[in-house]
Amino acid sequence: MPNVMEYSTMPIFALELDRDGHLSKKTMKLAREEQLTNTLLQGFYPGIRVATVDVPTEPLDACEQAIVEQALTRVEFDGIRYSLVGASGSAKKGKFYAVETKYEKRLAERFRFSPQAAMTYFGILVSSCKVMIEVPDCRLLVVEDRQLGTNDCRGWISHSLFKRLQAKHREDLVAQEMQKLLANRKHCPGEHEDCQLNREEQATLEERAGSKIDHKVLRGHRFYQFRLAFDKAQAKGSFKIMADELAEKLEADVILPKSSVKPRYQGGVLRTIRSILGDRQAHAFRGSVLVGIRDVSRDLEFQSSYTLVEHAPDDSIELEIKPNALRQIERLRKAWEENNFTELFELLGTQEAQSVLDVGEDTDPEYTSSEYTVADGALVADGTGYMLKHPFVNHHLQRVLARWAYRLCTSGGFRLPGFALADDGYLVLDRGQVFCSSDWIPNDRGIASVPSRQGLIVRYPIRMKEDLLPFENLSVDEVLSLLSADLEKHGCHMSDQQAAAVVDQQLRLKGTLTLHSEAAARNGGDFDFDQVCVVEGDKFPRFVRDRIMYQEQHSAQKNKAPKPPSPWWNLPQVAMQARGNQIGSITDLKTSCLANGRDDLARQLVDQLQNALDQLKHGTQPDQDVIRNVRNEVSKAPWLKLKQKQRIADMDEHLPVTERDKIGKLYNFLRKELGRYFSDAAVAPLSDFRGLIGGGGFTPEIFAECSTINKYYANVVTQILSRRRELWNELENANAAVEAKKDDAEARKELLFRRNQASAAYSAFEQRSKEELRALIDQVRVWAQGKNGTRLAYLSALHAIVCRDRGPDPEHEFVPGTGSIVFYAFPQEVVDQIAARTGGRPVSVEIPSLRDGEVEIDREGRIFLVSHFVNGDGQVHERLIFLAQVTRKGEVFCERDAQGSPIIAERVRPFPIEAGRSEVQGGMVTFPGTQRRPEVPKGRVALPGSPN
């Protein structure tokens, strides 16, 4: 049986310092990132003790700043001395990493004893990967960017090394699944905990585990984000796969551009001289290498944003964006009135129809769909519609709809296809010669799997209109023609068939948008797995045309000036300077400038936004005087204040906006169309759901244990909500004090500082409370995971406790709430019980080519249109006309080829098929006698908004 890496889970101690320098322990999360699962740091030093240290993010006076900096030099917990060693992207939120002091020097050496480099790049070592392996004898080659078909942060990995990663990934997944299956088996009736499997049982269990995880294994024909370490260096970026023949020719299993190595690769004087003299192997390394795959390209979907729509022309808003939004509102209204969840589930990230699968993708056969959260799963499984009234589900739904309504009213609510940004580099071997090239497609062209010929490439955050990059989408034939011409230029005369294979394997990878590096850099992109989306010219022709005709007025490039050197002992001071994330506030201030018709002020903020983006990497700082002066010139766009509303009913139906405020006018137009979707009577008491969970007998001991865990959960949530309310009141009082002294300049200065402290403290607590709630949910889930074999009993007891009438009870203290703990502790069991107790919802499959009408479905999944005709005897008869078939493997087809083989149109999640009569409406066919069984993946939760 395959084994998981021994050091696959390393817990991190979560600590925090207050402004007085007092150190305390935070609740520990169980996420992969918080356990260093599959990280480089774990690979270097198995068993190393690591702690995160959170510092205050609010403004500190000189004394408080010095106290916190001193405290960072002497972190001690449970008798272990820790030393600060760096940060990840979370430095902006005041979160830093510390390790046992004995490891400090070794880690500092990896960053050349530079505090700035450690603050910027330590995150490479603690980034959790999907899979990681150590290659004892790896051949690694470092080259200049764009040599051997590389580009900015984009390298090559050999096919055989990728297959090893793929095999290790599968091995890890199978081992984890086997552990689950064995745990379930031990708690089955009649089984003993020490039972041993015979060879046949072991093989059967391994086969079952393999079938359940096949769809999760790394797939080929993708773009891969990596983390890598060799010698005393670390690297990050993206890989394409090169053929093994090329790897042997170049004597390299991995090829890295220098830009991937962080801090930037130097290589020594002798290697540099050899490189200048043309020695391709000058920067070759052979030895132990740790390499991991962090992410894989796939088809993505981005939501529109007001930072995008504010650059749309008026005619696009009127004729393209508004009509799309109105159609969404009408579909939602109709679905709501008819109790049809199709559109509603789409808003929640689920689908009424069976989800379409990727080619070659496998799924867990026990479930008909995979939902985003347990609340979504409850709605999908419910056959009555009454679960909408459940306090927890209703609260979740209200929040989701409020977020959707805000997006709709401020950005039109449309969706954009998303991609990983990839380069055009290729590397081929033809007739024993190596041919390669980079940046050979024209600057204004791109390769993307969208039907539109023209489009705009969007990379968030959007600094200015110039960031919306117009591009022309190359067809397959055009890419092939350009590639053939470039190969010819380099003396390569491969066949069209071979060139087509290069296009397929290196240039049109799934889930990627391929660009020239100069084009990517125009809006701040590189090839370190940046993600972009596309405004399609076919759907938004006026928007795209307006940007193409626009005369650019400003250019903002990344500031890559080297950081000033600083000694290692200044690491705490550098850490405190890295705090603070102004990206969001500057972006919203820029938006307010545009809403007030002050385009000139918005342009002043473009460079400040870039400085904020470069703050951690390049040590730049936004000019606070510029920001302050702009803030004094413009008022905040009123619709920005509605961003955090939890219910549609709390969003103003009309706002006072300026004539130049495109988003404000769009909001006022769409908000009045939304109306209200929930009344005060929309929520039923928890006691209405007492009979929902049944069939699990429990003992008084189980009931008492569940009562204890419920009290603990409710107390923690209550404390968090109470503290949030206290901080909010402090902020309100600080605002009132500033307003009361608005004419006293001297007093106002101190009061403004305290107000800013209160505001930052409230914002920091909002983020921290989310982390603590997730940690609490993790604790509840760990408790529940130990109940294998008695899960239904514990679920029944816990459900009875939270749904009990709130009358006095001398033995048990019950806390009112939404019943959220039940959904978090036993998510899959709750959803399964809802499906069983309500009768569930039938499975539907969308086949757009089907015409509406009555259909008959047989046991093989064949769908026949029922046609009625009158025979010569005057009697009405039926004729069955074949329309389509959904096989038991989930294959959907409507016709066969000349050899009689089905032409597969798409694949859906397989489900048990029953024969019977049904109806087709709008291309949707419902299968009679079926029941949806949603799967709720672990870790997907909606945070509670109230105790219990």
What are these regions (language model features)?
Residues 1-524, 530-531, 536-948:
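Beta-strand-enriched accessory nucleic-acid recognition/scaffold domains that flank the catalytic cores
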